[in-house]
Design a protein with these regions (language model features):
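Short amphipathic alpha-helical/adjacent loop interface patches that line ligand
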Residues: 45, 55, 66, 97, ...
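Beta-hairpin "wing" of winged helix-turn-helix
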Residues: 70-81, 87
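N-terminal helix-turn-helix DNA-binding core of bacterial DNA-binding proteins
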Residues: 16, 20-61, 83-94
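Amphipathic alpha-helical dimerization/coiled-coil segments
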Residues: 1-21, 39, 93-119
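Alpha-helical residues within the helix-turn-helix
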Residues: 53, 64, 70-71
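Short, structured secondary-structure boundary patches
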Residues: 25, 66, 82-84, 97-102
């Protein structure tokens, strides 16, 4: 019985952690400039200066946006000499994907059930 409660508690904590990660990522994605930066990073890793010239804002502003994206787990930085190069961190999008799927799974099942009933 204690083991069962422990497992349930662990699953609850994992769900809460995943939801917190999804919330952090969604909050970071709530700023259009950050979405634009992520779109640019889809083509490959880039330095802050490169990104700043492409989004037409200061390097300082891009650095602040990248810091938010990094804290949310959506990008990762790598030192390349004196520069930091940023890349999309695909794994950071998993909690968002799980969150969105949680809305679709019941609806898709209901649709499947309706289709099977009508046969």
């Amino acid at each position: 019985m204690i083991l069962s409660a422990s497992v349930k508690s662990h699953k609850y904590l994992l769900v809460k952690k995943s939801e917190a990660q999804a919330a952090a990522a969604l909050k970071a994605l709530g700023e259009p400039r950050r979405v634009e930066i992520l779109r640019l990073l889809q083509s490959g890793p880039q330095a802050v200066g490169e990104l700043a010239s492409r989004v037409d804002v200061t390097q300082q502003a891009v650095s602040l946006h990248l810091a938010v994206l990094e804290r949310a787990g959506l990008v990762e930085a790598r030192k390349l000499g004196a520069r930091s190069v940023y890349a999309v961190r695909i794994a950071g999008f998993a909690p968002v994907e799980q969150f969105v799927r949680s809305f679709w799974a019941p609806r898709l099942k209901a649709l499947k059930d309706d289709i099977e009933k009508s046969r």
